[in-house]
Structure formats: C-alpha cells, structure tokens
C-alpha cells in the first residue's frame, strides 16, 4: 500500500461554505474597487527575494523568519510572494509611473509565509489589497479608512479601528533613541527577539506579542510627543475628518505595524469576535518604496486584509437554492436519448444531472435532492413526450419534447 500524502503543513483545501465566503469577499472587494476607481493588478507569485529584503526591512519578521526563498536553476534568489505592497510598488515603477497620480491599484490572491500555523493563520493564505500610490494629500488616508470600513461592513463583520502616526523620518530617529534609552533599563526582562530589535529597530518592540513584556511596553514613550508641528497637525486633521464622518476610532500609541516601510498614518481594524490575535486589516502611509526600486519618491498609502481570518468570523451564508434537473431514463433506447437531453439542457444554461450506470431505483433515490426530475421511458419517447416530476410536491405532468425546455425554465424560476 502506498504511503498517504497529506496537504503541506500550514495549508488547507478550500471548498463548500469556506470557498463560497472567499468568493463573496473577492466580489465585494472588486465591486468596491470599481466604485473607488481602482485598476485591478495581478502580480506574479514569485519575485526576486531582494525586492522584499530591500523594502520590508531586515528587522521585520517576514524577512528574518518567514520568507520562502530559494535559488532557481539560473542561480537567481527567488521567493514566494509574502505580501502585496512591495510587489505592487515594483509593478508601479515598471508600468504605471507615467499615469497621473494617485494611481489606485487593487489586488487579490495568495501569499506565502513560513509561520507557526494557528487559527486564522496559514503558510499559504490570501489577502485583499488596496494601494493609493502618489497620494500626497491627507484626505487619501481618510478615504483608505472609509473604504476599509465599508469593505468589512459589506461582508457583515463588526470592527474597531485603531490609529497612530509614525511621523516623519526625523521624528522616528529621535523616537528610536528615546526607546533605546527606555528599554535599556529592562534589558534583563526582554526576550531574545526584543533584544535583537533593540539593536536594529526598537519600534518593533512595541509590537511584541510576549505577555511578559506587556507592562514594559505600556510605559514606553509615545511617538506623538516627538512629532514635528506639521506632522502632528496632519494627524489631527485626519482624526478631525474621521469624527466629521462619524467613524469611531481610538488612538493607540503602541500601534507600529509589522513592516519597516511605514511612515505617517498607520491604522488597524480589529474584531471583538476574535481572541488575542484580533487584527483583521491593517495599513498605513509610506514614501520610500518606489525610490528604493529606482522610481521617483512618492507618498502613498494602502491596506491589506487576510481572507482566512475574515472567513472564520463572517456570518453563516444563506443556503444556496441550487435548482437542479435530474434525468432518469428507463430502457436502453431512452438511455441514449437521455444523454442527448442532458447535454442539451446544460448548453441552454440549466443545471442538469444524470447518474451513469445505476439502476432506475438508485437514480430516483439520487433525484430526490433535485428540484425537478425528467423521467424518460421508451414508450413515452416514442410519443415524443417525457414525464416531469416536481420533487417537493410529487406533482407530475406529461410534457411534449418541443415544450420541455420552456416548461423546465418556468418550474425552476
């Protein structure tokens, strides 16, 4: 006996209601992208590893621990796409720089990270992604939050919104020094990961999931206290407009996001229906990515949402009313004609089925799940007729073949 081969750890097969939910999420996102004048973009699943090392930051968990990278047969360092923003920016530099800004790009598809599998988190997962590239005015940030909120509302998910600002580059450098001075006092209480972050990027300690570091992080300096007047004014303007639009949110001074390219506004949507891992959607502003890839420096903003986590907390979908026509032939001649009828009905857009190689009794048993059954006997066929049975009521009628299609359409309406 051959050894059973299961799916790869951290992946899963999608079917049934889970797949239906994914298709619904994708359709809602696409409809919103059309309303907000986005261009849909599909980037390759494989990219040069350097693209993500250069743009996500060497201190990010994605680059340090999670990226699936390998050398191809030509010796190039290639990776499976771990996130969308860097890939979308690469596509912008190659294909969209000549277009009037902001360039609005929408993507949906699979991503890959070598993470510890847990509820709502897989090594192959899917995201919906929106990017506004060349979005200078702060109102584009407001639009991003409004779109994100609309997206979650339309798929029936409750959410809470947290915002913060990372300010300009000068702000972040001053703030990093303040964090280093603060966390140095607690070095003996920091995890190995946080000690490494203390050397490379202390902001990432604020994103620590280690319960033993929670109280230390709570007492850390606040980045808004290090903002320039202009950066603080812009953040306050964004908050004022969100209040004007009756969008509830809270300012979270420890929110930093997990990737190093963010600057300015950052935001995260969480769900009260999830546990400790409650983030549903996140994003923020960035300005260095395009320049890092040989393009011009452009202020941009974007967000992404993990589909698997959304699927887990979406409301149960209403049952689909699949209206199916079953065909049950009786006799060898009827069997051949029933096959012709089966493919004819399908070509006319009806959902039709016929079980091959079964007895009449077994076929009728299978047909109980259908809306309508067409019973085709040899004697009836010789008269140019079939029996049509409505399965819910058991009502039967004899229908001439030339009227069969129109009768079935009426019964399936």
From Swiss-Prot:
UniProt keyword annotations, A-Z: Aminoacyl-tRNA synthetase, ATP-binding, Cytoplasm, Ligase, Nucleotide-binding, Protein biosynthesis
The keyword Aminoacyl-tRNA synthetase belongs to this UniProt entry's keyword annotation: yes
One Gene Ontology term from the biological process aspect of the record: histidyl-tRNA aminoacylation
Coiled coil start-end: none
KW ATP-binding (keyword) present: yes
Stored InterPro entries: aa-tRNA-synth_II, aa-tRNA-synth_II/BPL/LPL, Anticodon-bd, Anticodon-bd_dom_sf, His-tRNA-ligase, HisRS-like_core, HisRS/HisZ
A GO molecular-function descriptor: histidine-tRNA ligase activity
Compartments where found: Cytoplasm
PANTHER family: HISTIDINE--TRNA LIGASE, MITOCHONDRIAL-RELATED, HISTIDYL-TRNA SYNTHETASE
Subunit structure: Homodimer.
Record protein name field: Histidine--tRNA ligase
Native source organism of the sequence: Neorickettsia sennetsu (strain ATCC VR-367 / Miyayama)
Record gene name: hisS
